[in-house]
A protein has these predicted regions:
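Cytosolic covalent-transfer regions centered on His/Cys nucleophiles
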Residues: 1-162
Length: 162
């Protein structure tokens, strides 16, 4: 069973980013994972570009907007070292897909080797948290990275019975 707490830290959280497009979001958040050493061979820009391509491939197959102004873009590729999560809260909602706006983004990176169940577990835990009104309210009101991280860890580690 995957532990979300092991996949995210304060260096992977960004609040009130002033980004205007989905492209800016995907590139900026992928760059964060790249700079934080979450992708293999972090000196090679092609690695970051490969991860961004994996994100776009997923978006083109089906939008990763999940409602409540949340998006969960995710990429499975050989350029990801180990599963990781990055979170961004934007200053303003942006157009994510037709009739879908997003302000809160969880980006998931999973290595091609780990993709199967691990990838689905992460999506389920984040999606379940997003369905919780209190989780969304707390993330909206969080004042700093530390508080945001505590909220994410608290809700993602809850055992759900429903």
């Amino acid at each position: 069973m995957i532990n979300i707490n092991d996949l995210i830290d304060e260096n992977l959280i960004f609040l009130d980013l002033d980004l205007k497009t989905k492209s800016e979001v995907l590139e900026t958040m992928a760059d964060i994972l790249y700079k934080e050493g979450k992708l293999i061979n972090s000196e090679d820009e092609k690695v970051k570009d490969g991860f961004i391509k994996a994100l776009w491939d997923r978006e083109e197959a089906f939008s990763t907007a999940v409602g409540f102004s949340f998006g969960i873009p995710h990429g499975k590729c050989e350029f990801v070292k180990d599963a990781c999560i990055s979170y961004a809260r934007l200053k303003n909602e942006i157009e994510w897909a037709e009739d879908e706006k997003v302000k809160y983004i969880f980006m998931i990176g999973v290595s091609a080797e780990q993709a199967g169940n691990q990838h689905l577990e992460i999506l389920i835990k984040l999606s379940t948290s997003i369905l919780d009104d209190d989780f969304r309210k707390k993330l909206k009101e969080a004042e700093n990275k530390k508080e945001t991280l505590e909220i994410i860890k608290e809700y993602a580690s809850k055992e759900r019975t429903s």
